[in-house]
């Protein structure tokens, strides 16, 4: 399963609750993008969440 290279975000799991409070499993997936960034001075392709990109924690090469 892919995860965010910077924050470590990955798919979260929980329950979907109906109006009658029946439960069924569901998942929340982060918006991961494959980007090239500099890691230790060398370009590397990694998965980064869109939120991390927007916050400016990483810059594309």
Curated annotation (Swiss-Prot):
Transmembrane in keyword set: no
List the taxonomic lineage. Bacteria, Bacillati, Bacillota, Bacilli, Lactobacillales
The answer on whether this UniProt entry bears the keyword Chloroplast reads no
Q: What is this protein called?
A: Large ribosomal subunit protein bL28
Organism, by scientific name, is Limosilactobacillus reuteri (strain DSM 20016) (Lactobacillus reuteri)
Corresponding gene?
rpmB
Which cellular component appears as one GO term in the record? ribosome
Superkingdom as given in the UniProt entry: Bacteria
Regions of compositional bias (Polar residues) in chain numbering: 9-25
Q: Name one GO molecular function term.
A: structural constituent of ribosome
What family is reported? Belongs to the bacterial ribosomal protein bL28 family.
Region annotation (Disordered) maps to: 1-26
Q: Name one GO biological process term.
A: translation
Concerning Gene3D superfamilies, the annotation shows: Ribosomal protein L28/L24
Give UniProt keywords alphabetically.
Ribonucleoprotein, Ribosomal protein
């Amino acid at each position: 399963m892919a995860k965010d290279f910077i924050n470590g975000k990955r798919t979260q799991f929980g329950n979907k609750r109906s109006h009658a409070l029946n439960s069924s499993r569901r998942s929340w997936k982060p918006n991961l993008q494959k980007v090239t960034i500099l890691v230790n001075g060398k370009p590397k392709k990694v998965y980064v969440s869109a939120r991390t990109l927007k916050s400016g924690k990483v810059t594309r090469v």
